[in-house]
């Protein structure tokens, strides 16, 4: 849940066999699929309610289970029940900022080929990432960001959305092509009560491996929405591998969100509303 599933969500865009469960209990999938599955429970804090509930539900099954966490109740349960687990470094950072740790852990646990690629990546272009993020943040000033991507890059668009929410402290939304052409465009007709001209900024995550028709849809949608006063930016994914493209774009998202937080003098680390909600949930 939250920042703890982001690594899995990014991997899902490269591996269709990965399924992300965002709920309580075990996934509602056919038994023949469940019986061939490995359940990897990830909670950075180790105290995520939904993850702990699913762990307990899985104990009454014979399905193979593993856990990834920094500690908390999940680590205790894994140790008591002799469940294979990986303990992440507890550096005090937010789960969304621990993407690298979680990617290494999950790919190692699953013996995923991405694990070896991760070890070869460098941060030589980090300064250019910050500049790109700062530029996008400037264009989003006083506007609600709308993140747009292909369906294949849905996980990346979602990463952008939650990073802008949690680090940037702004509302942000995402959608994918071609689906958004069948509904979301209608929300920007002039004269609607919900549309304030000039109050949105769309960021298009463009991958040169996207289907040609998807790329055309993005381009036309960008033109149509600009006529409705929706400003926009295009971020072209770069890298020699899929995972490098994803992580580069994630890096830029972090810088964008950080600069947005600075614009409003918000604390990029703290998540007070989420913490307040959790306290009320436990009352």
Language-model regions, residue ranges each:
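A short, charged, Gly/Pro-tolerant segment at domain boundaries
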Residues: 271-283
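A generic structural motif
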Residues: 21-26, 68, 170-181, 231-240
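Conserved active-site and cofactor/substrate-binding residues in soluble primary-metabolism enzymes
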Residues: 2, 6, 10, 97, ...
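Glycine-rich phosphate-binding loops that contact phosphosugars or nucleotide phosphates
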Residues: 1-127, 138, 198, 205-233
């Amino acid at each position: 849940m939250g920042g703890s599933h982001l690594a899995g969500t990014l991997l899902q865009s490269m591996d269709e066999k990965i399924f992300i469960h965002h709920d309580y209990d075990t996934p509602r999938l056919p038994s023949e699929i469940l019986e061939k599955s490995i359940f990897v429970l990830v909670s950075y804090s180790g105290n995520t309610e939904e993850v702990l509930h699913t762990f307990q539900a899985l104990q009454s099954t014979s399905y193979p289970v593993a856990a990834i966490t920094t500690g908390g109740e999940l680590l205790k349960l894994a140790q008591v029940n002799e469940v294979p687990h990986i303990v992440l470094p507890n550096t005090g950072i937010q789960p969304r900022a621990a993407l690298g740790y979680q990617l290494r852990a999950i790919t190692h646990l699953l013996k995923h080929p991405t694990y070896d690629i991760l070890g070869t990546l460098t941060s030589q272009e980090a300064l250019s990432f910050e500049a790109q993020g700062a530029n996008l943040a400037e264009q989003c000033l006083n506007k609600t960001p709308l993140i747009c991507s292909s369906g294949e890059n849905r996980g990346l668009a979602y990463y952008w959305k939650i990073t802008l929410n949690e680090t940037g402290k702004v509302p942000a939304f995402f959608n994918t092509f071609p689906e958004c052409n069948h509904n979301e465009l209608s929300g920007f007709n002039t004269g609607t009560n919900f549309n304030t001209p000039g109050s949105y900024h769309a960021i298009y995550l463009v991958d040169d491996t996207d289907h040609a028709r998807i790329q055309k849809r993005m381009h036309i949608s960008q033109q149509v929405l600009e006529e409705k006063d929706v400003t926009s930016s295009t971020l072209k994914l770069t890298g020699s591998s899929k995972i490098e493209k994803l992580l580069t774009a994630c890096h830029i998202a972090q810088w964008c969100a950080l600069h947005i937080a600075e614009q409003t003098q918000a604390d990029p680390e703290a998540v007070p509303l989420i913490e307040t909600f959790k306290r009320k949930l436990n009352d």
